[in-house]
């Protein structure tokens, strides 16, 4: 009977140790849940960015207006007959 109690105490101690310390412990689970939440937030931010980029690609494929806007803003291009004015801020 004493052996049975001793063996049961050892098993309970092993299970308690695993519950509180090491891989699969409560602290480990909480850390992983936080990491999952952070990763899901990052994924949502990246999904929104991908939607914006896909819309921009679609606009560039279908219309000349988007291409013209991109050429003007990124490359400083102007149309024939236009005059370019650059306003420099003194600050």
UniProtKB/Swiss-Prot annotation:
Residues 1-3 are cytoplasmic. GO terms for cellular component: cell division site; cell septum; plasma membrane. The chain crosses the membrane at residues 4-21. Residues 23-63 form a coiled coil. NCBIfam families: PRK00888.1. Belongs to the FtsB family. This is Cell division protein FtsB. It comes from Teredinibacter turnerae (strain ATCC 39867 / T7901).
């Amino acid at each position: 009977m004493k052996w049975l109690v001793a063996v049961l105490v050892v098993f309970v101690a092993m299970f308690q140790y695993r519950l509180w310390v090491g891989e699969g412990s409560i602290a480990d689970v909480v850390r992983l849940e936080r990491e999952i939440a952070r990763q899901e937030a990052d994924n949502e931010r990246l999904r929104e960015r991908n939607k914006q980029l896909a819309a921009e690609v679609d606009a560039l494929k279908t219309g000349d207006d988007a291409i013209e806007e991109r050429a003007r803003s990124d490359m400083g291009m102007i149309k024939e007959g236009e005059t370019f004015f650059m306003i420099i801020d003194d600050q």
